[in-house]
Amino acid sequence: MAAGSTIDALGQFELHPVLGHLGEALRFSQSPLFMLIAAAVVLVFLYVGMRPAAVVPGRLQAAAEISYDFVHDLAVSTIGENGATFFPFVFAIFFFILAGNYLGLLPFSFTYTSHIAVTFGLAIMVFIISILASIRFQGVGFLKHFLPAGTPVWLAPLLVPIEIISFLSRPVSLSIRLFANMVAGHVLLEVFAGFTIMLAGLGAFGHVLAIAPIAINIALTALELLVGVLQAYVFAILTCIYLREAVAH
């Protein structure tokens, strides 16, 4: 939030070099920094939670096992018999997004999933891997998906371009969905936090009025916790669906 009474809800998304002059030289901003932090957090969580495996698991081990089983079941049940092959990729995607969403809720942190460059990069990676999987499992036969079975020949000039556009739009819709949800949630949190600070500066009466935006901010934070995991889940399951289509014969 800027000085005075102005609420700068979009300032939180600005990129600035970190690590001083080294960061400026390397163009190293908060986004890659928090990506590294997120990766480290997930790796530590899994390493500490899974090693050594106790007969009676503790809370951390139970959480790690539940997380592993959840994503594994999601990949296998959605993709099918080849689900185990793509499980590591789906697992990495899910936890990279989840960690980014949740880290962004901490004070003085940065939400890298609120940047379209990041979400589009993830979506393009999913898109390319799904194409490579299509070629690997179906060969040139994957082109038949652009003309549904039983379609009259005279409809082909109309349906094929529509199917191609729909296929090419996947990374766009996948990236915008995550990006828009993260931006909207954090803007609302910043706005109501700004209202709270502004009202608190009005004296005793302002302190009373500040109760409402504080309550709203608490509710929004709880909602963001839910949205954070839901968006990671939606991205992961859509990835699984695209991969299922890619490996289907």
From Swiss-Prot:
GO terms for molecular function: proton-transporting ATP synthase activity, rotational mechanism. Its main location: membrane. It comes from the Bacteria. PROSITE patterns: ATPASE_A (PS00449). GO terms for cellular component: plasma membrane; proton-transporting ATP synthase complex. The chain crosses the membrane at residues 30-50, 86-106, 115-135, 146-166, 191-211, 218-238. InterPro entries: ATP_synth_F0_asu (IPR000568), ATP_synth_F0_asu_AS (IPR023011), ATP_synth_F0_asu_bact/mt (IPR045083), F0_ATP_A_sf (IPR035908). It is a multi-pass membrane protein. SUPFAM superfamilies: F1F0 ATP synthase subunit A. It is found in: Cell inner membrane. Key component of the proton channel; it plays a direct role in the translocation of protons across the membrane. F-type ATPases have 2 components, CF(1) - the catalytic core - and CF(0) - the membrane proton channel. CF(1) has five subunits: alpha(3), beta(3), gamma(1), delta(1), epsilon(1). CF(0) has three main subunits: a(1), b(2) and c(9-12). The alpha and beta chains form an alternating ring which encloses part of the gamma chain. CF(1) is attached to CF(0) by a central stalk formed by the gamma and epsilon chains, while a peripheral stalk is formed by the delta and b chains. This is ATP synthase subunit a.
